[in-house]
Amino acid sequence: MQIGWAIVVFIVCLVVIFFAADFVLDGIEELGEIWKVPTIILAYILIGIDLEETVASWSAALNGLPHIAVGNVIGNTIISICFCFALPAIFFEISFQKIRKWIMLSLPVFGLWIILYLIFPQLRIVFGILAIFSYVGFVVINIVSKDPLKATEFEENEEEGENKVSEAERKYLKKKIWKPILLFVIGIVALYFASEWLINSTHDILNAVNIDEGVFGLIIIAAGTNVEEYMLLFKSIKRKTPEIGLGGLIGKIIWNNGITFGVSLLLMSAPSAIPLSILINGILFVGVILPTLIIISLNYKKLNWKSSIPLLTLLCVYIVFSFVF
């Protein structure tokens, strides 16, 4: 494949992945409304689960590109923290008051599995399983420990809604359910094929211009699939519900470092030596960026233009390291 055509395919696939993920999320959202799914579950499904990043990393792992799979997770997480958090904070103050402390303190657990994998890649199966179980534990704790008042309120509203729903409305809802299911299926199929072509075009570009695959995964793919996160946080801030966008970003970080990373380790073949660029950026992420975010959220309990400066500075350091090493 000529490099010009490979670049076109790469760009088209990114666009398809972006919109296909919207199809999936729209479908799940409508299903949640029809089935009266609790808000906390909807938040994880609609916002926290990062389908395009997951599919891209898993496809990379299956296609013999383990460094892109892992680099994509690290790069996406660094950009989510240093850019998706910091950019809106330049214009609006973001409060962490409604984010429970233990959620922020759980982030280093996921970072630990990444660092251990980078040091001992031969134990990838062990660290992959630990990352997956860490995410499952995170979800279970959230469901079990949710606010009893909110749970009671939801149950009461659900009972009232059931009493008010007529037989005609029930039939209408049964017909309506096919639309979100169709959206979901179309989105999943489009995501699968677009991700396959994305990885193939990536491989062709790497071969043509001799770009290190770790650098490519860390910056280009990771940056290109974060557009919806920027818009989500901006909109939630303008609607005076910043905890929705903030919770979505945190959920995405935990999903990618738990499920996306963990399953990628299980799918990939034995990797060669870890590239220096990925190792350095992994240390930067776990040893510097995560502690900075945790300190800001727990000590200052808000993110504004002043506290966003350290994160933006770390983003610049990350980009420089990615190209230098």
Predicted regions and their residues:
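Hydrophobic alpha-helical segments, chiefly the membrane-spanning helices
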Residues: M1-F325
